[in-house]
Amino acid sequence: MITVLFGGSRENGNTATLTKKILKGHDYQWIDLTKLAFNPVRDVRHESSQILEYNDDYQRVIDQVLESDEVIFASPVYWYSVSGTLKSFIDHWSETLQDPRYQDFKERMQKITFRLVLVGGDSPRIKALPCVQQIEYSLQFLGAHLADYLIGYAEKPDDILHDQYAIKEAERWNKLYSF
C-alpha cells in the first residue's frame, strides 16, 4: 500500500500535481496533513510518565504509515524547509518512541520504502537539499532511509508542468518503482 503524506496548503497546487503524476495509475492513500490537527509534541524522555494517548489525529496517521509498504512525503518548500504540517507530523515520532504500544516502531519504519517530493521556487534543486537531509537524517535515526527524492521548480499555479526535468522524473518514477 502506498501512502502519501501531503503537507501542501493547496490541494491542487504544484506539489500535488507532481506527486499525482508520479502515482498515476497506481492505488494510493492520500493524507492531507493540513486538514488534520496535531497537538504540540510532548517530550517525556526525562520524566516518569509515558505517552498513552493522542488527543489529535496523529495516531490514526502513524497507524496508516505503519501499515504502508511505501510512503511519499510531499511538501512545498516553505522558507527553505518542508511545510510546518509535515514537520509537525515528523516531530511526533518522538512521542511514538516513548509510547509502549509502539515498541516495534523503529523496526516497522525500517520496512517501509520512503520517498520525498519537494517543489519550490527559489533555486529549489540547490536550496531544498537541506530538506532532503532533514528527512534522511530523521529516517536514519529510526534505522530507515530515504530511497529517493524529486525536487521540482514552480512559482505560480501549474508552473510545475513546465519543469521538464521534474515531469520526466515523475514519469520515470511511475514506471520504475513497483508501487
Briefly describe each language-model feature range.
Residues 1-98, 103, 165-179:
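N-terminal beta1-alpha1-beta2 submodule of the flavodoxin-like/Rossmannoid cofactor-binding fold
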Residues 3-5, 29-31, 115-118, 147-150:
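Hydrophobic/aromatic beta-strand patches that form the interior of the parallel beta-sheet core
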Residues 9-12, 77-80, 121-125, 155-158:
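Short histidine/acidic/glycine/proline-rich micro-motifs that form metal-
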Residues 20-26, 133-179:
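Glycine-rich phosphate/pyrophosphate-binding loop and the adjoining helix
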Residues 34-36, 120, 152-155:
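Short, solvent-exposed coil/turn elements at secondary-structure transition points
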Residues 39-44, 114-116, 150-151:
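Short, basic/glycine-rich phosphate-binding loops at helix/coil junctions
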Residues 41-42, 127, 159-161:
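Short, well-ordered secondary-structure micro-motifs
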Residues 102-147:
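Short, glycine-/small-residue-rich phosphate/pyrophosphate-handling segment
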